Structure formats: C-alpha cells, structure tokens
Amino acid sequence: EFLTNFLTTYPDIHIVKASSTGYGELLVKNAFDFEYSLVETMAHYKSAHTFLPEVDFIIDIGGQDIKCFKIEDGVIDDIFLNEACSSGCGSFLQTFSNALGYSPEEAAELALKAQNPVDLGSRCTVFMNSSVKQAQKDGASVADIFAGLAISVVKNALYKVIRSTDPSLLGRHIVVQGGTFLNDAVLRSFEMELGSEVIRIDEAGLMGAYGCALHAMEQHKRDHKSTTTLSLAQLSSFSHRTRTVHCKGCTNACLLTINSFDGDRKLISGNKC
C-alpha cells in the first residue's frame, strides 16, 4: 500500500535500487523483489558513520528492543541486545504516558520540567506499574514520574543490557538512534548518566532505513543494473499466499512457513536444522 501510494503520488520518481532491513527484511525483499537486504546492525552503523565518521559507540532504542554496538577501528567489535522483553523501550514509555492520560510528546515535555524525578529503578513493566502507583500515593507530580520513567529507560539500557560498570567509558563519540531518543527527556537523562553530550540526528527513528538506502546506493554504483523492484503496474496485481508444511528432509520435521508471491517468488522460513 505504501509503495503504491508513493509511486502514485510521485509519478516522476524512479526507484533505482531498493534494499530492506530490520524485522522481516527477507520477507519484504522477496515480496517486492528488492535487490538487496542488509543486517540491521550494519544499517545502523552505516548511517551513524555517515554523520560521525569517528563514532565508537552506537545505542539504538526502538519501540520493542535495544541494540548497542561497540566500534573499534571502523569495525563492529561487540553487540549488546536486550534479551528478555520490551521493558525500557519506546512502547514502555508510551504505555505509561497513555495510562496517565498524556501523549508521549506531552510526557517528554513535562519530564524536562521535573524538579524531583522519582527513582523507579529499572524493573519490568509489571513491577514498574506498582512503583508508579506508589509514587502517586506518595504525592509525586506527573512530571516527576515521567522524568523517573525516562531515567529508568536509560538505566535499563546501561546497566542491564550493556551491563556497564562505568558509563563514562563507553566511548568518546557516541551516536544515539531509534525513535525513543526523539524523547528529549530520555536524551537528557542519557547525557546526564554519561556525564557528556552525545550525537542525535534529527531523524533518529529512521537511521536504520537511511543506512539501508546508503547500502543500495553504494551497490548501484558498482553494477548499474536496472532495478527489479515491482513497478506500479506490477503492484496492482500483487498477491501473497501463506501456508505451512512439515519438512520431510529429515526426522526433525521442521514446520516451515512458505510465503508465495506473484511471479513465482517464494520465501521459506522455519527451518531449524
């Protein structure tokens, strides 16, 4: 639907090459016959490196997950991911702001004006809910609660995901990415915990997509081949079918999901062997 609307609205734009990344990158690549796909970590590094070539640490906090990369000599040297749940991510903040009757944007603005941020720790959403209710009973203002939530997101990333003992040693050139960092309260909390400023690009929530686009552009400069991405006419006849089968290749009998698209394009997933 997005591609159809985009190509209809901007008929003079010609897609030279296309690439996908993130969750479902191979599904999207096969569905729309994109030329390339790129692992999400590389997409984030490529975009951060474009804006800050000397970047040595990247932290990406999205709606559902946290990804952190340590960069050494221009190479990703270590990766940290949240392993348990989405606590401490964008959805976490949205859940609590909505529960208290505010939009995430309003909550962020209030948090920046907090005088005494509440110490809510960095626990999961279930326990955090109890902490928030207790803070309300103790007379904490909404601004102080929102500030406490922003701080908890930062502490969760630093001390539970990265397991840092000294945040000031993470790096000298840090880039923060992901939609959660568009929340100025989270950004400020992160800088205060580190004791230094970090770099946030205006379109922090689109850095993965930007890095992916850079990858497609670089590849095109090498081969100059015509794109295989579906045209507007081809999109009008787009079809997608899904079925599951048990693989008979061995005794494991993996349950495979077969995604079939028009033009005999297929993506098979679920193979655990």
Task: Briefly describe each language-model feature range.
Residues E1, V55-V75, C250-S260:
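Gly/Thr-rich phosphate-binding beta-strand-loop-beta motif of the actin/hexokinase/Hsp70
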Residues N5, G148-G171:
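Phosphate/ATP-binding catalytic cores across multiple sugar-kinase/actin-like superfamilies
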Residues G22-G24, S152, T165-E193, A204-G205:
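Glycine-rich phosphate-binding loops at beta-strand->alpha-helix junctions
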Residues K46, G90-T95, D202-L230:
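Glycine-rich phosphate-binding/hydrolytic loop that grips phosphoryl groups
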Residues K67, E218-C273:
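Acidic, glycine/GT-rich loop-and beta-edge segments that sit at the periphery of enzyme/chaperone cores
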Residues D73-N116, L214, E218, F261-R265, ...:
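Glycine-rich phosphate-binding loop plus the immediately following alpha-helix
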Residues S130-Y159:
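Adenine-nucleotide phosphate-binding core of ATP-dependent small-molecule kinases
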